[in-house]
């Protein structure tokens, strides 16, 4: 007689007790996904995007750019976008749990997380109330934009114009500069998923 497979379900409190071992631990409705440390190309693009967003938004008080960020919805969901834009008035809290105005989540697609980011996290962010999600495709040197109430994965190359309803004016990002001098190694373009369930 076959035995039923039991998949462990975790809480945000459980996740806080996990080791700080260089891997990324995330929860989606209690399901745990572990992905390895990202490659150089992934980190370079994420850093450039965070820097470009910070520069473009510096005249907007109360808007912050971090990378990586954390989106928490207790008790069983905690996701870590590579770059996150959020609004917070006054002194910043030390707890991600208290942030509720996340305006943008950015995921840089990499072999260890490509399928998970594209097929699960994108929709999870939107369902959690994040109004816009960018998936950054290193292979195509493009950004796939998904917004609440709009068709997903609108492909943008060259110049990205972010016309968020939260901003008093659009901002523009030069994607050619973001992807400049990017020579991806085989491990960063083969699209294999290496994340594993604990």
Where are the model-predicted features located?
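Gly/Pro/Ser/Thr-rich low-complexity, intrinsically disordered segments predominantly at protein N-termini
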Residues: 1-198
């Amino acid at each position: 007689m076959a035995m039923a497979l039991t998949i462990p379900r975790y809480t945000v409190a459980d996740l806080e007790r996990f080791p700080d071992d260089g891997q990324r631990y995330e929860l989606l409705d209690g399901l745990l996904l572990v992905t390895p440390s990202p490659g150089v190309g992934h980190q370079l693009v994420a850093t450039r995007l965070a820097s470009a967003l910070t520069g473009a938004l510096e005249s907007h008080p109360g808007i912050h750019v971090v990378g990586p960020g954390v989106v928490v919805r207790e008790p069983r969901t905690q996701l870590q976008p590579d770059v996150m834009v959020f609004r917070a008035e006054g002194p910043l809290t030390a707890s991600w749990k208290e942030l509720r105005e996340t305006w943008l989540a950015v995921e840089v697609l990499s072999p260890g997380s490509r399928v998970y980011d594209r097929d699960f996290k994108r929709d999870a962010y939107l369902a959690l109330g994040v109004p816009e999600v960018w998936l950054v495709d290193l292979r195509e040197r493009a950004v796939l934009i998904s917004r609440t109430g709009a068709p997903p994965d609108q492909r943008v190359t060259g110049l990205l114009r972010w016309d968020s309803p939260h901003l008093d004016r659009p901002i523009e990002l030069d994607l050619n500069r973001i992807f400049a001098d990017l020579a991806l190694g085989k491990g960063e373009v083969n699209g294999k998923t290496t994340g594993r369930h604990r």
